[in-house]
Amino acid sequence: MKLRISLLVILISMLFASCGISTGKGTEQKEEEISVLRYDKLLNEYVRSNSFSAMQKLTMDYRQPTKILIEDVLAIGTVKDDTIFQRLQKFYSDTTLVRLVSDVEAKFPNLDEVEKGLNKGFRKLKKEVPGTKVPFVYSQISAFNESIILVDTLLGISLDKYMGEDYPLYKRFYYDYQCLSLIHISEPT
């Protein structure tokens, strides 16, 4: 009889666990929070310091954003090319891009406000469209090529396209009317 009761308790426990029924003790999973990976800082660490650990993270941990940046956004080659990381380093060593990277780091020391906005937006979206998957969000510097990258479950934000309409480098590459759309990322539209 004790064996049956023990088995019954184990089966009921397994049933509750597999069905996700909460016991009310705070074991339920928190809603998914968005945290923006500072891919731009990781890439800059590689470019400026020739950091092997940063290169490993780019190629192993963040393979997809690296492939998208190199092949689609910058179009400087393929990730399979043996010299692609030297080419990437040379590309971002251009004096204009060095200034751009420095300005982006000064303007966006952290992305707390962006993360708050993304979390608020995705909470609203999930209410309207249940089952919506939250993408992996990262920041990058696209050399003025793209504003937003959206591929599968990735969302890339090119911070260099959100420096504010009066940003001096925009004047060199864009017409005045184009600069109007290059607002600071935390400004309301």
Regions found by a protein language model. Name each.
Residues G20-R87:
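N-terminal mature-domain "stem" immediately C-terminal to a signal peptide or N-terminal signal-anchor/transmembrane
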Residues T59, D82-T83, T95, S147, ...:
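Coil residues (strongly favoring Ser/Thr
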Residues R63-T132:
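Post-signal peptide N-terminal segment of secreted/secretory-pathway proteins
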Residues N145-L182:
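Hydrophobic alpha-helical segments and helix pairs
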Residues S181-T189:
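Residue-level detector of conserved catalytic or cofactor/ligand-binding positions
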